[in-house]
Regions:
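Helix-loop "lid/cap" segments that line or gate small-molecule binding pockets
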Residues: 86-87, 107-121, 178, 211-212
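Short acidic-hydrophobic, aromatic-tinged amphipathic segments that line or gate anion-handling sites
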Residues: 262-266
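Substrate-recognition element of Asp-dependent hydrolases with the DxDx(T/V) motif
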Residues: 83, 150-179, 187
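Non-catalytic pre-domain segments flanking phosphatase-related domains
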Residues: 25, 36-66
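Active-site neighborhood of HAD-like aspartate-dependent phosphohydrolases
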Residues: 54-102
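Short hydrophobic alpha-helical segments enriched in small aliphatic residues
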Residues: 7, 13, 22, 26, ...
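Substrate-recognition "cap/lid" segment bordering the active-site pocket of phosphatases
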Residues: 142-143, 171-223, 229-238, 252-253
Length: 274
């Protein structure tokens, strides 16, 4: 492991030998099941570290604040369909899936400003934006689903007593609707775009601060998880450690260019950070 020659030993995981510790130290799974007493193949040096693992428990996070689109849910098809419905009704050219992928992340108004020719300066913009919202309110779940491994991750976090919340630049109605459909057993709060109430959208810290208040935790006790440059900036502005996911709407190089330092390829890897 790590290029070093360590003697390998096969041990049974103790009750207090957390799975997060196993993942954190890159321990290789020996038997593929979820029994906490399963055997793991680890180095002797790493096994000796298990006595230190108990001390890590004291520094664990108490909460996770999630972005929604591209992080918990694949929503791109429904966003594209709503965009193209509105554009078509207004006699405007439709957009491809890749174009819509590039447009999302800053809220649906900016999505439509990018999709509509001449943006907000187009005389038909407000009408087209209203058509988008009308369509999306009804069709926000036609082709939407959680990413593979998300529901299992949320269940594990719940078992561990980790509190969770969603903050999204998506329309608040849609955020709460999707939360109720998929995550009602897990989320303490689900907060969407609420600028009319004086809560600025991401990357301003307002939404995260509201979530932390509802969770009853401080910024040091929570981590932020998202898939975009907006999420990286949001975490920084809110004083939270950021974990960037690679399965969302932005690729790895883009995330790194925008300051991502903690990258995960699978939902289960988030357990390394709590």
């Amino acid at each position: 492991m790590g290029g070093m020659a360590h003697a390998k030993v096969c041990i049974h995981v103790e009750e207090d030998f957390s799975r997060a510790f196993v993942l954190k130290h890159k321990v290789k799974l020996f038997k593929n099941n979820d029994d906490r007493n399963e055997a793991y193949m680890i180095s002797k040096t790493e096994f000796e570290k298990t006595h230190i693992a108990k001390g890590e428990e004291e520094n664990r996070k108490k909460a996770v604040v999630f972005d929604l689109d591209g992080t918990l849910l694949y929503t791109l098809e429904d966003l594209k369909n709503a965009t193209n419905y509105a554009l078509k009704q207004s006699g405007m050219p439709e957009r491809t899936l890749d174009e819509v992928r590039r447009f999302v992340g800053n809220g649906v108004r900016l999505l439509m400003e990018r999709a509509v020719p001449q943006g907000a300066d187009n005389p038909k913009f407000e009408e087209t934006f209203a058509l988008f919202k009308e369509y999306y309110d009804v069709h926000c779940n036609d082709n939407t689903s959680p990413y593979d491994g998300i529901m299992e991750l949320l269940e594990e976090l719940k078992v561990r007593g980790i509190k969770m919340a969603i903050v999204s630049n998506k329309i608040d109605f849609a955020v709460k609707s999707l939360d109720k459909l998929y995550f009602k057993d897990y989320m303490t709060a689900a907060i969407g775009e609420m600028e009319e109430e004086g809560i600025r959208k991401k990357p301003a810290p307002d939404m995260v601060q509201k979530a932390l208040k509802e969770l009853g935790v401080t910024q040091d006790e929570a981590i932020y998880v998202g898939d975009s440059d907006v999420d990286i900036a949001t975490a920084k502005n809110s004083g939270l450690e950021c974990v960037s996911v690679t399965w969302g709407f932005r690729d790895v190089e883009f995330l790194k260019e925008h300051g991502a330092t903690n990258l995960i390829d699978e939902p289960v890897e988030l357990l390394n950070y709590v």
